[in-house]
């Protein structure tokens, strides 16, 4: 409720938000109650050009309208029980992930070149369009490509493999090629407006998350700046996932660990920033032929384990024995 007792459904319902302030908020990218509710007073003040006291009041009222508050563990359990899942195309991989790719969560796939990261991204951008009884969400996908690896030919083949009309399936994928790290971050900053206009969006993919940051901020002298920007970028994606009940998938590369003499000599790029932000981290490895190995590296609610899946002409499938 606003101060005058009116139920708050949009920014214009907030007390003290006239057309002038509303225009400033929208122009700054704060076009919904959710965006305002999770902003900091300082960020909102600077971005919209309004006093910090005004920003604090607007944020407080938006949070009250959205019921952002402490919750009991039972309430959290009920919310988790309502988490939706998207099939990967492989029952074995779905089982490893606890039923598929979760909404409200960031899932990271990392591995060497050819380990299946991009193939999985293509497949899941098709799977999200399926009806719920077939493992989808009747939704659309946003695909942010940082390395130029998106291939419409694979989308077309996977759509046919899933029984979808290829042109319709491709029309349900919003694609953007990010040319540098600033552009990549700007795309995500603008996503909220797109999601507000098209609530059918249920999946965001960034393939890959770190490539531009590594190229533009090399060396130890740039490490702090790189990690700060990457951390902000990751948290913006998590915020979108939680606000709009969307699944977020990021892919990541690996690098050698010269200090490792036993076990896996590689580790995911991104350091501690990427170790802690994704809710689920999955390592992918090549196997024989079209087979790939997926291993849970970190997920607080899932047991460790690994499975084998296959990449076929029609998409990601269970591996044949």
UniProtKB/Swiss-Prot annotation:
Record Pfam families: HHH_5, Rad51
GO BP field: DNA recombination; DNA repair
Cystine pairings recorded for this chain: none
Molecular function per GO: ATP binding; ATP hydrolysis activity; ATP-dependent DNA damage sensor activity; damaged DNA binding
Binding site for ATP: 111-118
Nucleus recorded as keyword: no
Function: Involved in DNA repair and in homologous recombination. Binds and assemble on single-stranded DNA to form a nucleoprotein filament. Hydrolyzes ATP in a ssDNA-dependent manner and promotes DNA strand exchange between homologous DNA molecules.
PANTHER family attached to this UniProt entry: MEIOTIC RECOMBINATION PROTEIN DMC1_LIM15 HOMOLOG, RECA/RAD51/RADA DNA STRAND-PAIRING FAMILY MEMBER
Similarity-based family: Belongs to the eukaryotic RecA-like protein family.
Name of protein: DNA repair and recombination protein RadA
Organism: Sulfolobus acidocaldarius (strain ATCC 33909 / DSM 639 / JCM 8929 / NBRC 15157 / NCIMB 11770)
Gene this chain is encoded by: radA
């Amino acid at each position: 409720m606003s101060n005058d007792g009116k139920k708050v459904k949009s920014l214009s319902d907030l007390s003290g938000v006239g057309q002038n302030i509303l225009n400033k908020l929208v122009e700054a990218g704060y076009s919904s109650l959710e965006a305002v509710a999770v902003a900091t007073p300082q960020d909102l003040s600077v971005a919209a050009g309004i006093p910090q006291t005004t920003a604090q009041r607007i944020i407080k009222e938006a949070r009250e309208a959205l019921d952002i508050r402490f919750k009991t563990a039972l309430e959290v359990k009920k919310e988790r029980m309502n988490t939706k899942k998207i099939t990967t195309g492989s029952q074995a991989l779905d089982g490893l992930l606890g039923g598929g790719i979760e909404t409200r969560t960031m899932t990271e796939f990392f591995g060497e070149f050819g380990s299946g990261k991009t193939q999985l991204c293509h497949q899941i951008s098709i799977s999200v369009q399926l009806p719920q009884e077939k493992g989808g969400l009747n939704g659309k996908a946003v695909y942010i490509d940082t390395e130029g690896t998106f291939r419409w030919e694979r989308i077309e083949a996977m759509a046919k493999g899933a029984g979808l009309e290829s042109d319709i399936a491709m029309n349900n994928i919003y694609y953007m090629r990010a040319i540098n790290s600033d552009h990549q971050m700007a795309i995500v900053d603008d996503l909220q407006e797109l999601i507000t206009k098209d609530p059918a969006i249920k999946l965001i993919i960034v393939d890959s998350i770190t490539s531009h940051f590594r190229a533009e901020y090399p060396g130890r002298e740039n490490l702090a700046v790189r990690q700060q920007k990457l951390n902000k970028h990751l948290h913006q994606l998590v915020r979108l996932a939680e606000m709009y009940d969307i699944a977020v998938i990021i892919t990541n590369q690996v690098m050698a660990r010269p200090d490792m003499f036993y076990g896996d000599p590689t580790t995911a790029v991104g350091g501690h920033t990427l170790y802690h932000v994704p809710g689920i981290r999955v390592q992918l490895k090549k196997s024989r032929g079209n087979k790939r190995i997926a291993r849970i590296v970190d997920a607080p609610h899932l047991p460790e384990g690994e499975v084998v899946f296959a990449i076929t002409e029609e998409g990601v499938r269970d591996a044949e024995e």
